[in-house]
Amino acid sequence: VSDLDANSLEAPIAIAVLTHIVRSIVDDADAVAVTSGPGKGDKILLEVRVGPGDLGRVIGRRGRTAQSIRTVVRAAATNDDVDVDVDFVDA
């Protein structure tokens, strides 16, 4: 049994920051979709879907771009008083 309710799965600032960053990186900004759901423990999982061919651009060389995005979004999530994990998925 989890003590999380539906309202605690919201991270509007983190989602807005994540969406803005990813849309500025990819070629097809309209194909970017961010969904949120329960993650491990008390974390919220933010799943990013990008258009075909854009996943490599978001992940970057050796995953450095993806790791940087995760770091910035986790910092933004502190304004939402939540912990987040970010996963990148090819649509």
Stretches found by the model and what they are:
Residues 59-63:
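Glycine-centered tight-turn and secondary-structure capping sites
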Residues 1-55, 67-91:
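RNA-contacting regions in translation and RNA-metabolism proteins
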